[in-house]
Amino acid sequence: MNPVVTISGGGIIGNYISLRLNQNSIESVVIEKSKNKISANKNIRTVTLNPYSKKLLDDVGIKIPYAKIKKINVFDGEGTGSIDFSSDEINEENLSFVVYFNDLEDALKRNVLKTTFFETEIKNFKENNNDKCEITLSNDKPINSIFLAGCDGRNSNVAKLASLKPVTSNYEQTAITFTASANLKNPYTAYQIFSERGIFAIMPLPSSTDQSFYTIVWSVDNLQIEEQSIEDFIKENISYFEKKLKANIKVNSDILSFSLSNHHFENYVTGSLVLIGDAAHSIHPLAGQGINLGFADADAFCEEIINAYQAKINIDKHLVLKRYEIRRKNMNLLMLN
């Protein structure tokens, strides 16, 4: 098997890259360690797409339900300071779009099933004398590729195999997320409140029938939940945000939580290997840009490869990858800092 690109990781970013390359007649395969199944989990986790990321998905034919955000109101819960952001300020119809994580992941997965190897990992890889990457899978099957794209998340398997060491820091915070019903006045507005009880964000959810459903992402210091359960913390503190928003909020899903930290690699490229999205970097969800940085990475990577192949010249893979790294690393570091 000799695909142009082998992709480690069949998540949102890896599957987007595979779909886009395949649509441009550039062969790719996806190596994914999980089983081939559509998510059975309830829709709780969401991602927020900026207009550019949504356009990238539109361009490859991904159609899923989304909620529009036209305005963001950010304010200080302890004082009177506030600031509004409107889609008018960026000459767009919408500031951003909220989609369910599972919906997006499943829609992309369906489009690349035929070129995905499930329940498989990359066991090792090396450069050969023909400037190809010799890849061995966990089932001992070989693959020869020009490019190996690491899209396998913050604990990237291929980054470890390449002995790349990330720079990491811990925010000492936990992100709590759940869905809720709320009687907010404007269904197209997202709110973010900074307070001693944490950073509380509430955004509309995709719905064809009811505009009273919202997703909540709540970042709290670990010390605040050290001596009580997350459920008890929510019960004790959500009334504070109800008063600030002048709305009633009712939790209507399970509660998910995860520790917050960031990481980045000083080099995104080594030999045939390139790190993309969360494999290369991760940031605080406060910025709401994690997935969008991943899509920007994926877009730059695909552009460089597609442009090189459309030029019908001998591909200098090291130049292609270096151009990607130059385009994306400094932009990502700006967001991290």
Q: How should each PLM-predicted stretch be described?
A:
Residues 52-59, 66-161, 169-177:
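Conserved N-terminal helical subregion
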Residues 226-309, 314-318:
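FAD/FMN-dependent oxidoreductases across multiple families
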